[in-house]
Amino acid sequence: MKHWIQENYKNRSWAGELNESQEGKQIVLFGWSFRFRDQGGVIFIDLRDRTGIIQVVARKELLGDSFTLAEKVRSEYVLAVRGTLKKRDLESINPRMQTGTIEVVLDQLEILNVAKTPPFSLDEFDEVSEELKLKYRYLDFRREELKNRMIKRHEFIFAIRNYLNKRKFVEIETPILNKSTPEGARDFLVPSRLNPNQFYALPQSPQIFKQILMVGGMERYFQIVKCFRDEDLRADRQPEFTQLDMEFSFVSQEEILSEIEGLVETIYKEVFNIQLSIPFPRMTYNTAMEEYGSDKPDLRFGMKLVDVSEIVKDCDFNVFAGAVKNGGTVKVVCVPGGSIISRKEIEDYTAWLNRDYKAKGLAYMKHGTEGLESTITKRFKKEELEAISKACGSKEGDMLFFGADEREIVNHSLGALRLKLSERFETPKENEINITWIVDFPMFEWNKDHKRWDALHHPFTSPSDESIPFFESMETLQKNAGNATAKAYDLVMNGVEIGGGSIRIHSKEIQNKVFQVLGINEEEAKEKFGFLLEALEFGAPPHGGLAFGIDRMLMLLTGGKSIRDVIAFPKTQKGLCLMSECPSPVEEKQLQELKIKLAKV
């Protein structure tokens, strides 16, 4: 390798940082040839490094025999360049490039490595299938989109650490090899070679350990942590993902919300230049479910669910009147301009809601020139139709969709329909951000399939002050489990839950009662959570916290379609890494060491 190359590794210039003030200076650059153009006697090479692109000009009359080396350059060759920075002629200025007013006139060139022709274009404006990008992730990093997202991710996490350090938080690493407590999603299990027939589990969250840290007196903890869940994947899920995990001692819910608002406001401004207004609005869980059909409502548009049960309870349309009579509800969502929705589309919506949300049907009315129109309007009095229209604020050209069933089915089905129709009729403004706290969650939810109570958040969530009397005895608690609310809170951005947490239970007595409600007996509780229950007997302080989904936040802030867009080496929706081809079989010897025998599938 030429001597001048090694001498300048430390003193290199960065392509994206060059500017006109350096005109006449000798510049040394390292990078990849992005584009090249041979114009007979002059070769133009767009040299790319992490910071940007600079045009390098090789002139035959200046280079002599060395010009033949420039002629060998092809796409993605690794180059070392030395030359003089010059301003471009006016007719050569490229306003689309950050360095479009300057160029480097080549003095010396070295090809450090050659490259095969890439399987896809590395130009940011060219469409490339996600499968190809995941298989050749190392090439995708050279594209502006992924590279910039990785840099933003670094800046985002750096800003978090910087802010929390100033707020007296201590970053502490919790174990990756954990005890399996399969209460939520499935655990990823790791067999122990030293302890045959025993298994570790990769952590779904550091929940118990961070509570232990509070018992230990650390008071303010945070961690940028990897979490693992073996679940079916969707657009916003990965088997491994990154959280900002936090826990506080001697703190109220109000103080936690305020602290988080300060953090979010600061990092959004520093990293993305987004100015937020704090405190963030708050909405109760009950309001979110009743008016939006979701505990993570997208509030950038209207189309609220409106309860019209009182209006239709005595109407002649038995689907509506019968639902109210049987203790259910009737709600309507008004779609502005939705009268253009075709009958075929309505049939498709009906089938979808029946399949995924158990909705028995989807009644509808159009708001025409004479008011509400439909095949069912003849079953309603004029006053009832007028009252429905007034309740939801419909006007000519709108479409009204109705749900009539159990309250839960109506809320979930119309909430899902609201989101689907918003993509067409209520598209939010570009770059609009709405962040809202959802508070006052139920502590438990009834599991119809297993006929039991489940924790809505997790078993360690503290009851609200209003619900504490329910915990005076197990008999009282069992009777009022459905009425108990929790000191729990979720932070929702544009219809996506980006964070959630709660005040924790610091009383062993209350914690044991919660376990009993959930059907976890004393022996099972001791086996799974014994070390936490024991720790609670050694002076556990009042404490609480939350976790942020860093991947989800960055997906929203960088305009990604999936969290795969902001993760360096993500898995597919089948949990596969197309680049490294994992998961993969292992050698029989490894299985024997672990005392594992594979079953035929």
From Swiss-Prot:
Superkingdom of the source species: Bacteria
Binding site for ATP: 229-231, 238, 497, 549-552
Keyword line: Aminoacyl-tRNA synthetase, ATP-binding, Cytoplasm, Ligase, Nucleotide-binding, Protein biosynthesis
Region (Aspartate) residue spans: 207-210
GO terms assigned for molecular function: aspartate-tRNA ligase activity; ATP binding; nucleic acid binding
Main location: cytoplasm
Enzymatic reactions: tRNA(Asp) + L-aspartate + ATP = L-aspartyl-tRNA(Asp) + AMP + diphosphate
Root EC class: ligase
Binding site for L-aspartate: 183, 229, 457, 504
Name recorded for this polypeptide: Aspartate--tRNA ligase
Gene expressing this chain: aspS
